[in-house]
Amino acid sequence: MIRKFIPILPLIAALFVTFSCDPTKNNPEVKDTLTVSPASLEFEAEDASAKFLNVTTNGDWSASPSADWIVMERTSGTGKASLPVKVKPNAGEDRTATISFSGADKVTVSVSQKGRNIVTVVANPDSFDGTKRSSTTYQLLIYSFADSDGDGVGDFKGIQSKLDYLDGLGATALWLSPAHPTPSYHAYDVNDYSTVNPKYGTEQDFKDLIDAAHAKGIKIYMDYVLNHSGTGTTWFKDALANPDSPYRNYYVFSDDPSADVAAGKVDNYGGGKNPGMGDWHSVSTGNKGYKGRLHYKLDWNAKTVTVTESTERAQSSNSDAKIWLFIGNDGCVGLYQTSTNVYEITYDTDTTWGFLVRTSTTTWDGGTKWGGDGKPISFGQPYALNNSTAADIIFGGATSYYFASFAQSMPDLNYGKYTECENSPAFQEIAATADKWINLGVDGFRLDAVLWIYQAQIKANQRFLDQWYQRLNATYKAAGHTDNIFMVGEAWEGHNTEKQYYKGLTSCFEFDYFDALTRALNGNASGYVSAVNGFISDHTAQRADAVTSIFMSNHDQHRAAESLGRKLEKEKQAAAMMLTTPGKPFIYQGEELGYYGKKDGGDEYVRTPILWDKAGMDCAKKGVNNKVDNTMLTSSISVEAQDADANSLLNVYKTWSRLRNIYPALAEGTMSVAPGNGNSIAAWYMTAGSQKLLVIHNTATTAKTVTVQDNTSRAVGLLGTATLDHDALTLGPNSSVVFKL
C-alpha cells in the first residue's frame, strides 16, 4: 500500500500569522480605547446651531446626557463617529451638564449654556458734591417769566422768587432778555442803556436778584443790543433835531446814501457796498430856516397863515401895521391889510429858525403871540395858528436818511471805522453803561445781532467784538474776578460763517447744532458725534479758550417741540442728548415744559409765559400782550402738574441737568466715538481726567440691541428702559443710558 505525504507545516504557519495580526484578540496586553473631543461644548442662550463631538474607537460606545436640554441624534454606535449636539433655548440662568460616554473607556464631556440672565438697568448716580459745574444757562424773558406784583408783566422780583426752580433745573447762569427802558414788549429797541425798565422793578430790585442768584451758584448774563438802539434815546432824538448834535455820529446818517456808499463813506458797511439787510429811512432833521423872497398872507378870520415862494417885488415893513410877523433877526415886520381881516406882505426873508405872528410889538403877554403846533409849514398851504402852544412856525428840516438793519424804530449805531471803533463816542458811551452793570454784579453778556454791527463784514465785526470783549473783560477783572467774563454772540448764520466770529468772542451760538440733533433723532444717529466734534474743533482752531454754545431754540425761532413734531418722547431724548453733549447748553424758557408754537401769528406765540400752577393765577400774559395759545397753556403743562409727575419732561430736564452737575466728564469732558453707532444708535465716551462715562442713545421708536464690551455694572443715568444680557444691551424706544466706567 502506498501512503501519500501531505505538507501541513505551511498551513500551520499561515494560521499562526493570521491570528497574530489582531493584537487585541491574540495579545492580551493590547486594549481598545475610546476618545471624545472636544472635552467641552459652550452654547449661547438662543443658540440653534449644532456643535460636533468626534468619537474615536474600534469598539462599541454609548452616550448619556445628564440633562434633558441636551439634544443628541445618536446615543450609541460602533467605531468612529461625528455626533451633532444641540441645546434647547435657555430663558433662565447659566447652566452646565455632562455627556457620559461608555465603551472601551469612560469619557465625560462638559456642556455649558449661557442663560439669558436679563438684568433690568437701574440708574444709581453718585451724590451731588455741591459744586455746580454743568455750565447750563437758562434763557428767560423778564416780561413773561414770573410776575411778582400781579400786574401781568414779569419782573425782577418774580425771577428771584423762582430761583429754587431754576436751581433745580441745574442752571449755572441765567440769560435775561434786555432789561432796559423800551417802548416795546420785547425790549430790543433800547431807549436808555444806563438804567432798568421800571416795569421790571428798580435798580435795587435788580441788584437783589443778582445777589440772590449768586448765593445759589447762578450767574447773571444781560442781553446787550449793540447793533442798534431805539428811536427814543436822548442820542437819537437830539441827532434828529439838530444836524450839529454831538450825537449825530452815534448813528448812520447820510444826506445822500447812494453817493456816500459809492464813495465808501458809510463806515457801518465795513468796507462793503451792500448792507445785506436793512433800509435807509428818510427824516426831516433840525430846522433849516429860510433865505429868500416869500409872500405871507394872514387870514385873521380863519386864524391861518399861507406862505408861498415869490418873485414879486419885495416890500418893506408897514410902519402903520396893526399886526406883525416876527421873523429871524429882523424882529417885527408890519403886514399890509388887503381886505377885511386879511393882511399880506412880500418880504425878503432871512431866518435860521422861522417866524411868529404878533398882535403887539411891546409885549408877549396876554395871548399876543401866535404860532403853530411845532410842525413845519408847507408852502402854499394854510397853516393853523394858535396862541396857546404858539410854537415857532418853522420851515422844516433838511431831508436826511438814517440806516436801520431791522425795523425803522431801531436805528443802527455807528462805531466809525472798524479799525478804530473803540475810539468812537458810541462805543465809549455804551461800554461805560456795561461797566456799570459789571460793577453791579453782572457776570456776562449775550450780544444781539453781531453780524450786522458792520453789515456782515466778518473782518470788521471780528475786530469790533475783540475790542468790546477786551474792554469789558478788563472791567470784569478790575472788579475782582479771577476768571474771564463770559460773552456769547448771536452770529445767526451757518457754521462756516459763525465759526469765524470766535476771532472776536470766546463763544457764539451754534445754530447748526439743532439740525445735527434732529438728524440724530430722525435716523442718522451715527453722524451725531462727528458733527458735534466738528463744531468744537472748528471753534478751538480759532481760539484755544473757545466755548461752543449749543441750544435747541430761542425767542426768535419756532419752538423746539414744534420742530420735533410735538412728540414727547423725542423731546425727552433731545434733552438727554443735549445734556450729555460737550459745550455750553442753553435751555429756553418753557422748553423744559414742552411748550410748542410757531412765529406765524407773531413772535409772542414762541415767547409764552410760564404757567406756574394749574390755575394759572400768576401767569405773566400781559407781558406778551395776552397773545398766548390757550389750547397749549392748560393745567397739564404747568410746573405744578409736571413737578408731581416723575415721568414728566420737566423731571427729565432736572434729572439730566443734575447728572451734568455731578459728573465733570459730562460738563467738561471730551467726546469720542464708542462702538455700536448706527442709524438709530448714538454712542460716545465722555472723558475728563480719570473719569470716563459711556453714553448710549437709541433714537428709534422700537427697541434696539447693541453689543457693549465696556463694564456696564454701574449705570448712573437712564431715560426710558434698558436691559442687559451679558454684553447685549437692549434699549427701549427713545431710551438713553449712561454708564460710569
Listing of model-derived features with the role each one plays in the protein:
Residues I2-F5, L9, A13-E42, T108-D126:
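Bacterial Sec-dependent N-terminal signal peptides
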Residues N26-N27, R116-A123, F128-T131, T136-Y138, ...:
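Insoluble glucan recognition modules
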Residues T33-L34, F52-P84:
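Surface-exposed binding patches on compact interaction domains or structured appendages
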Residues E93-A104:
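A short beta-strand micro-motif common to beta-rich folds, especially ectodomain repeats
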Residues V122-R293, V357, G396-C421, N439, ...:
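Acidic/aromatic-lined carbohydrate-recognition and catalytic surfaces
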Residues F253-D256, Y476-M617:
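Conserved alpha/beta catalytic core and glycan-binding cleft of carbohydrate-active enzymes
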Residues A478-H481, F551-N554, G565-L693, T699-A703:
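Loop/helix patches that line or flank the sugar-binding groove of alpha-linked glycan CAZymes
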Residues H726-L741:
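C-terminal beta-strand-rich structural cap/linker in extracellular carbohydrate-active enzymes
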